[in-house]
Amino acid sequence: MAEITASLVKELRERTAAGMMECKKALVEANGDIELAIENMRKSGAIKAAKKAGNVAADGVIKTKIDGNYAVILEVNCQTDFVAKDGGFQAFADKVLDAAVAGKITDVDVLKAQFEEERVALVAKIGENINIRRVSALEGEVLGNYQHGARIGVLVAAKGADEELVKHLAMHVAASKPEFVKPEDVSAEVVDKEYQVQLEIAMQSGKPKEIAEKMVEGRMKKFTGEVSLTGQPFVMDPAKSVGQLLKEHNADVTNFIRFEVGEGIEKVETDFAAEVAAMSKQS
């Protein structure tokens, strides 16, 4: 049984856009042969499904704002990148953000109700659907934010840090996408799910269960580090972890929030040729 390395899984993910679990499973079934894994995934429809899931409504804006020890992050969606850059749409998103900060509103339904009339008027003017999708907030001793264009926004709350450090941490979160602050914060459900996957891979390599379990223990430590902020290599100095960086500054991150436009939304794509053909039949 060939060893299923992290680099092999990464390459398959990059080539197919499929999820990590799906790629691991395909590589195990193909005995580590990446070309065979791709062929099998094409036959099973896994690649097609992954591409469909990746067709998110990736249009709109992420907005962030800090007011003293309180910060808000907001996502407002539209249907095209053209409208996302429209002045009227941008002004609407800014107005919603200001209201969320001023009123400390974290319930998106409250924001939707407050701005429904303006939203409807803007939809009529622009000709695209507009949605106030989500809003969240952080409070903390020191707050930092970072925006990668209008598509990615991050808030970070920390203790004992200066503004520059928190800004750099926010940039790291934008780039590295941690899911938790510290390895010990990784939920038992996530750990157990990954453990079972790794154990199955180790067992299928022909190792005795006792040896396989020891192998998996080491892999799990690596896994919890990879998905947590403090366990990741710092993007501006990969020789040290974010945890080491914080220790050097006698600082601590209490929480962070990362929003990316359209994540989790499936975008409906129009087949232009099919649409024209359908219209010609009707005429």
Curated annotation (Swiss-Prot):
One of its GO terms (molecular function) is translation elongation factor activity. It is found in: Cytoplasm. Keywords: Cytoplasm, Elongation factor, Protein biosynthesis. SUPFAM superfamilies: Elongation factor Ts (EF-Ts), dimerisation domain, UBA-like. Residues 80-83 are annotated as: Involved in Mg(2+) ion dislocation from EF-Tu. It comes from the Bacteria. Disulfide bonds: none annotated. GO terms for cellular component: cytoplasm. It holds the Pfam family EF_TS. The keyword Cytoplasm applies. NCBIfam families: tsf. Associates with the EF-Tu.GDP complex and induces the exchange of GDP to GTP. It remains bound to the aminoacyl-tRNA.EF-Tu.GTP complex up to the GTP hydrolysis stage on the ribosome. Belongs to the EF-Ts family. This is Elongation factor Ts.
